[in-house]
Swiss-Prot record:
Non-catalytic component of the RNA exosome complex which has 3'->5' exoribonuclease activity and participates in a multitude of cellular RNA processing and degradation events. In the nucleus, the RNA exosome complex is involved in proper maturation of stable RNA species such as rRNA, snRNA and snoRNA, in the elimination of RNA processing by-products and non-coding 'pervasive' transcripts, such as antisense RNA species and cryptic unstable transcripts (CUTs), and of mRNAs with processing defects, thereby limiting or excluding their export to the cytoplasm. Signal peptide: none annotated. One of its GO terms (biological process) is nuclear mRNA surveillance. One of its GO terms (molecular function) is mRNA 3'-UTR AU-rich region binding. Keywords: Cytoplasm, Exosome, Nucleus, RNA-binding, rRNA processing. InterPro entries: ExoRNase_PH_dom1, ExoRNase_PH_dom2_sf, Exosome_comp_Rrp42_subfam, PNPase/RNase_PH_dom_sf, Ribosomal_Su5_D2-typ_SF. SUPFAM superfamilies: Ribonuclease PH domain 2-like, Ribosomal protein S5 domain 2-like. This is Exosome complex component rrp42. Component of the RNA exosome complex. Specifically part of the catalytically inactive RNA exosome core complex (Exo-9) which may associate with the catalytic subunits rrp6 and dis3 in cytoplasmic- and nuclear-specific RNA exosome complex forms. Exo-9 is formed by a hexameric base ring of RNase PH domain-containing subunits and a cap ring consisting of csl4, rrp4 and rrp40. It holds the Pfam family RNase_PH. The lineage of its organism: Eukaryota, Fungi, Dikarya, Ascomycota, Taphrinomycotina. It comes from Schizosaccharomyces pombe (strain 972 / ATCC 24843). One of its GO terms (cellular component) is cytoplasmic exosome (RNase complex).
Amino acid sequence: MQLSLPELSYTHKSITEFEPAIRNDGRSIDQLRPLSGQVDVLPGTNGSARVKWASSVEIVIGVKAEVGDATPEGGKYVASVEISPSVSIQNRETDEIPSFLTSALQDLLNALAVDYLKFTPSKAWIIHVDAVVILSSSPYENILSALSLAAYLALQTTRLPKISTPNVTDITIGSTKYEPSEEYDVDSEWENALPLQGLELMSVIILVSSIDQVIIVDPTIEESSVAQVTYAIGVQASGAISYTRVVGTGGGYASTGRAITVERYIELLETASTVGTKLLNASSDILSFKGLGFFDILP
């Protein structure tokens, strides 16, 4: 998205020359855009969620579990992100956005435990986390945050059929304490299905930008364009940082022109941690309203 010099100048001055900073959509510097979510939206899946990020981004995720070959670590999570035909991107055959989003989601999933997904010496659950971007006003919008939040909610609602194996009486989902047998039974009763484990390690991604002396959360395209740098930062429910990636270097229009300092980098991490934990805490309320429509998330 090409912005004019007057647009860049106005955005930069509004943020850096006023106290408090004036953002073009009226938010405070540490405020996310309005967002809402819904869970259990896709019949036939093991878990699902849908998230709207402002009026510009909407993502739906379905989680499907299948029995597959065990890995040395146990089972595995497999991410996939597609862009709906209704979303305009330059060239669907060569565009890097789907692969970038898939890679980012896979990085978050790789933090989750998979050892317990193995239930025989050679078989384990393979968890497919499939996302579709069904609305994006621009490929440069904040898709990462919506994607990670939708994945978090979908995994929270996911249930796996209970597995029984010979000579094992205490089964959660799978078990690393089994007799060396390839026999197993899958319980088809949904009410006996069990939740995923270790989801406290799943992260939500918060975007933060440094614009001269100001740090802003969830930057717009205009704000990212005048920032020295924009980071995507993964935050777990505990506030721990699990993921960092530079996703924009706007060139610092009319800025100091200097690279950010270590101290500023730490400030960016701390800001993301605070906002991310609030978002995860607020989003947990949605889980009580399965299938009842969209609910606002107010971190």
